[in-house]
Amino acid sequence: MNTSVPPAVSPNITVLAPGKGPWQVAFIGITTGLLSLATVTGNLLVLISFKVNTELKTVNNYFLLSLACADLIIGTFSMNLYTTYLLMGHWALGTLACDLWLALDYVASNASVMNLLLISFDRYFSVTRPLSYRAKRTPRRAALMIGLAWLVSFVLWAPAILFWQYLVGERTVLAGQCYIQFLSQPIITFGTAMAAFYLPVTVMCTLYWRIYRETENRARELAALQGSETPGKGGGSSSSSERSQPGAEGSPESPPGRCCRCCRAPRLLQAYSWKEEEEEDEGSMESLTSSEGEEPGSEVVIKMPMVDPEAQAPTKQPPKSSPNTVKRPTKKGRDRGGKGQKPRGKEQLAKRKTFSLVKEKKAARTLSAILLAFILTWTPYNIMVLVSTFCKDCVPETLWELGYWLCYVNSTVNPMCYALCNKAFRDTFRLLLLCRWDKRRWRKIPKRPGSVHRTPSRQC
């Protein structure tokens, strides 16, 4: 949130001179107009993508959706009104429009900061408390937190901006100017800058550091776990074939149909290639799991009937409808079974941990991009706020204008961060821009043997 008034709206700084050259006016108007258009277009793409692509409807993306709403408000109203104010050199829309613009601008800006805090805390608890927090992490609870973030932003700024003049008994804002009346004192501006920018940034950076450390610890634990499963690594992947189970004492091979999974109730498992999962975005991966560490079906794409071991003769052939089993010997030259299931369990545990780690890294990458963009675009202006508290005339007017506009540019950059760090957003943006998205038609395209991927048909 912009915690001070811009140069043209500050009582301590003269407004933009009406005599600016036509080329300067044209350059400023075209540049800011393009930025506003890019901001509106990018954030509308986020909203439409969330609507048409069900894979994006994850809890984490609900926070991004709220952030996009705040950025859309800034791109639609704040950018254009501020540009008009700068180019005209005075506020010509009246006091009511001035107060409404400031209230909308500050509420949306503060909501952006609150949503960034929510995203940071959500990532932090998801990584540090995966079991207890994920059980409570529902869309309804996320919507409640988002609603509270907007409510707090509204309560903090809207009443004070709209009704301060009535509380003190007079309006002290100079004629032809538009700024927040109670922020005309530098010490108050300094306090709001500390509370609205520096404190949230400190909290977000601390949380991100904790997330980074926890993710690194998990990576080391996973490496140690994978290093201890030498029996499981020699047999290759177990995601595309069924093993026969030998007897407990190394007896001859069991007949077809008597495998280690025949004792379980029959069910159809959907196979997902592990390499393919690594290529999926964080949102789609999260939709494949119901809890922390739970891996989607990754064993076999077969339906095994229940077989009675006593009723089945050793020489009886399996029915035609039953799939053939593929025996894959271990290093010792015999099928995995009995004691061999223990390394297989470690292999599956390592795969689940790897899946969870990849997902968390993708989410952390999105968070880091958004946080970095926020710091880079908001820090210059808030540094100038601190400087002006102790030296009113030390900051040139042009720097004030650039710094204030740079805060708005953050709303332009955020959708780019989503696209760069999230494959689902990137692909959906591309299809929407090329007019190739049709959410009503889907087709199944096997990307690899043993895997099924659902993609939208691409037609305008």
Curated annotation (Swiss-Prot):
<dbReference type="GO" id="GO:0046541">
    <property type="term" value="P:saliva secretion"/>
</dbReference>
<dbReference type="GO" id="GO:0099170">
    <property type="term" value="P:postsynaptic modulation of chemical synaptic transmission"/>
</dbReference>
<dbReference type="GO" id="GO:0045211">
    <property type="term" value="C:postsynaptic membrane"/>
</dbReference>
<comment type="subunit">
    <text>Interacts with GPRASP2. Interacts with TMEM147.</text>
</comment>
<feature type="topological domain" description="Cytoplasmic">
    <location>
        <begin position="210"/>
        <end position="366"/>
    </location>
</feature>
<feature type="topological domain" description="Extracellular">
    <location>
        <begin position="1"/>
        <end position="22"/>
    </location>
</feature>
<feature type="compositionally biased region" description="Basic residues">
    <location>
        <begin position="328"/>
        <end position="343"/>
    </location>
</feature>
<keyword id="KW-0325">Glycoprotein</keyword>
<comment type="similarity">
    <text>Belongs to the G-protein coupled receptor 1 family. Muscarinic acetylcholine receptor subfamily. CHRM1 sub-subfamily.</text>
</comment>
<dbReference type="GO" id="GO:0060078">
    <property type="term" value="P:regulation of postsynaptic membrane potential"/>
</dbReference>
<feature type="transmembrane region" description="Helical; Name=5">
    <location>
        <begin position="186"/>
        <end position="209"/>
    </location>
</feature>
<dbReference type="InterPro" id="IPR000995">
    <property type="entry name" value="Musac_Ach_rcpt"/>
</dbReference>
<feature type="modified residue" description="Phosphoserine">
    <location>
        <position position="451"/>
    </location>
</feature>
<feature type="modified residue" description="Phosphoserine">
    <location>
        <position position="457"/>
    </location>
</feature>
<feature type="transmembrane region" description="Helical; Name=1">
    <location>
        <begin position="23"/>
        <end position="48"/>
    </location>
</feature>
<feature type="glycosylation site" description="N-linked (GlcNAc...) asparagine">
    <location>
        <position position="12"/>
    </location>
</feature>
<feature type="topological domain" description="Extracellular">
    <location>
        <begin position="165"/>
        <end position="185"/>
    </location>
</feature>
<feature type="transmembrane region" description="Helical; Name=4">
    <location>
        <begin position="143"/>
        <end position="164"/>
    </location>
</feature>
<feature type="disulfide bond">
    <location>
        <begin position="98"/>
        <end position="178"/>
    </location>
</feature>
<keyword id="KW-1003">Cell membrane</keyword>
<feature type="transmembrane region" description="Helical; Name=6">
    <location>
        <begin position="367"/>
        <end position="390"/>
    </location>
</feature>
<keyword id="KW-0628">Postsynaptic cell membrane</keyword>
<feature type="modified residue" description="Phosphoserine">
    <location>
        <position position="254"/>
    </location>
</feature>
<dbReference type="GO" id="GO:0090316">
    <property type="term" value="P:positive regulation of intracellular protein transport"/>
</dbReference>
<comment type="function">
    <text>The muscarinic acetylcholine receptor mediates various cellular responses, including inhibition of adenylate cyclase, breakdown of phosphoinositides and modulation of potassium channels through the action of G proteins. Primary transducing effect is Pi turnover.</text>
</comment>
<feature type="region of interest" description="Disordered">
    <location>
        <begin position="225"/>
        <end position="257"/>
    </location>
</feature>
<feature type="topological domain" description="Extracellular">
    <location>
        <begin position="391"/>
        <end position="397"/>
    </location>
</feature>
<feature type="modified residue" description="Phosphothreonine">
    <location>
        <position position="455"/>
    </location>
</feature>
<keyword id="KW-1133">Transmembrane helix</keyword>
<keyword id="KW-0812">Transmembrane</keyword>
<dbReference type="GO" id="GO:0043270">
    <property type="term" value="P:positive regulation of monoatomic ion transport"/>
</dbReference>
<keyword id="KW-0770">Synapse</keyword>
<feature type="transmembrane region" description="Helical; Name=7">
    <location>
        <begin position="398"/>
        <end position="420"/>
    </location>
</feature>
<feature type="topological domain" description="Cytoplasmic">
    <location>
        <begin position="122"/>
        <end position="142"/>
    </location>
</feature>
<keyword id="KW-0807">Transducer</keyword>
<dbReference type="GO" id="GO:0030425">
    <property type="term" value="C:dendrite"/>
</dbReference>
<dbReference type="InterPro" id="IPR017452">
    <property type="entry name" value="GPCR_Rhodpsn_7TM"/>
</dbReference>
<dbReference type="GO" id="GO:0040012">
    <property type="term" value="P:regulation of locomotion"/>
</dbReference>
<keyword id="KW-0472">Membrane</keyword>
<feature type="topological domain" description="Extracellular">
    <location>
        <begin position="85"/>
        <end position="95"/>
    </location>
</feature>
<dbReference type="GO" id="GO:0050890">
    <property type="term" value="P:cognition"/>
</dbReference>
<dbReference type="InterPro" id="IPR000276">
    <property type="entry name" value="GPCR_Rhodpsn"/>
</dbReference>
